[in-house]
């Protein structure tokens, strides 16, 4: 495969991933904005209350400022999903937490749960943010696409010298999902993860039901 063709294929996979994440990204932003709206409405009611001496209203205004700053941070985080910052670094633990939360936006409807085992040495390992986010979230989405029905997803980190491994496995669960499982947009597979991994020079392997991503640990 020519390099240009490989880039086109990788970009096509990235588009599929973003389409799948659209609901989670929207819910993330709406949750932050609804908090601001709620505080603003409470503050307005306090201002209409003649018995209020103004102190509680000032408290609500201060809370709105805090909520707005949190919303700004969330917006920046969402923008990074759309256009990753070149050379940005994150920890494996942080990346896993963000990716599982975002990819698992509809897991309650699928009766799917994730169990994360992240020892401190692995969780604190610094790795490329763009590679980690892209590969972890794509791996999780591929697991749910390839294993319809309720799942128990195991995510395990392990420090391996100058690299850190992330192992993912999906096990069928006996929990009954409230709704029938369905694939959003297009199904992703391990071959899609492997193609993106090659674009980031990340080693990826598969042994039976277990998939492994090996990230290079970056200097602090």
Language-model features: locations:
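Conserved ATP-binding N-box helix of the HATPase_c
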Residues: 19-42, 126-154, 186-200
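Histidine phosphotransfer helical core of two-component systems
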Residues: 2-3, 7-10, 14-17, 21, ...
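Glycine-rich/acidic phosphate-handling loop/turn and adjacent ATP-lid/helix
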Residues: 159-194, 218
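Hydrophobic coiled-coil of the DHp/HisKA dimerization-phosphotransfer domain
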Residues: 85, 89, 124-129
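Glycine-rich ATP-binding loops of the HATPase_c
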Residues: 198-213
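Conserved catalytic submotifs in the C-terminal HATPase_c
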Residues: 113-124, 160
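The cytosolic transmitter module of two-component sensor histidine kinases
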Residues: 14, 18, 29, 53-57, ...
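Conserved DHp (HisKA) dimerization/phosphotransfer helix of two-component histidine kinases, i.e.
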Residues: 39-42, 56-113
């Amino acid at each position: 495969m020519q390099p240009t063709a490989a880039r086109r294929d990788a970009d096509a996979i990235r588009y599929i991933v973003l389409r799948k994440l659209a609901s989670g990204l929207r819910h993330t932003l709406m949750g932050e904005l609804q908090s601001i709206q709620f505080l603003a409405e409470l503050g307005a009611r306090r201002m209409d209350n003649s018995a209020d001496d103004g102190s509680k209203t000032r408290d609500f205004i201060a809370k709105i400022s805090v909520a707005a700053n949190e919303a700004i941070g969330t917006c920046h985080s969402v923008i990074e999903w759309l256009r990753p910052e070149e050379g940005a670094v994150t920890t494996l633990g942080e990346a896993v937490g963000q990716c599982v939360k975002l990819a698992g936006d509809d897991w309650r409807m699928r009766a799917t749960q994730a169990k994360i085992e992240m020892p401190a040495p692995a969780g604190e390992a610094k790795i490329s943010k763009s590679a980690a986010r892209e590969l972890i979230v794509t791996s999780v989405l591929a697991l749910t696409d390839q294993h319809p029905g309720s799942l128990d997803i195991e995510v395990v980190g392990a420090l391996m010298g100058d690299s850190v491994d992330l192992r993912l496995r999906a096990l069928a669960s006996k929990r009954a999902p409230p709704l029938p499982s369905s694939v959003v947009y297009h199904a992703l597979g391990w071959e899609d993860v492997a193609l993106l991994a090659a674009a980031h020079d990340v080693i990826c392997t598969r042994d039976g039901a277990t998939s492994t991503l090996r990230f290079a640990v970056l200097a602090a």
